[in-house]
């Protein structure tokens, strides 16, 4: 049962063109202020698949202490509750809606 749920989650997070377009709109409304060239947050270009807390940014200790990469599951968990995923993180904005998180992740996967 857990494998089926995981497969459904993975498939739901795939970057389809429509999902990415919705994700871009959500990103522009919710994320771009800090992650669109501002020093407030790191650039998210290439974030999907990248090692967590890697790149030219002063990441929080909470994120630096996380092992692994930004998989769909990790991005989903972080967007759902940044402070639960990485206690001490600087990011306080969360995305409660599952579909919105999936759309944002789909868009993030298009950023290179």
Kindly give the residue locations of the regions a language model identified.
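Bacterial N-terminal signal peptides that target proteins for export
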Residues: 1-6
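N-terminal signal peptide c-region/cleavage motif recognized by signal peptidases
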Residues: 10-18
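Sequence/structural segment immediately N-terminal to covalent heme-attachment motifs in c-type
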Residues: 20-41
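Extracytoplasmic copper-binding redox domains, predominantly the cupredoxin/blue-copper superfamily
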Residues: 26, 54-56, 107
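Short cysteine/histidine-rich zinc-coordinating motifs and their immediately flanking basic loops
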Residues: 41-47
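Axial heme c-ligation environment in periplasmic c-type cytochrome domains
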Residues: 42, 56-105
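Hydrophobic aliphatic residues
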Residues: 48-51, 79, 108
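Short, solvent-exposed mixed-charge patches
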Residues: 111-112
């Amino acid at each position: 049962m857990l494998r089926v749920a995981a497969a459904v989650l993975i498939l739901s997070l795939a970057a389809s063109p429509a999902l990415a377009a919705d994700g871009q709109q959500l990103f522009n409304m919710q994320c771009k202020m800090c992650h669109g060239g501002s020093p407030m947050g790191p650039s998210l270009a290439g974030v999907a698949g990248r090692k967590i807390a890697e790149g030219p940014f002063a990441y929080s200790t909470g994120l630096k202490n996380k092992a692994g990469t930004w998989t769909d599951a990790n991005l989903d968990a972080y967007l759902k509750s940044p402070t639960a995923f990485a206690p001490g993180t600087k990011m306080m904005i969360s995305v409660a809606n599952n579909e919105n998180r999936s759309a944002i992740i789909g868009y993030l996967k298009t950023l290179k």
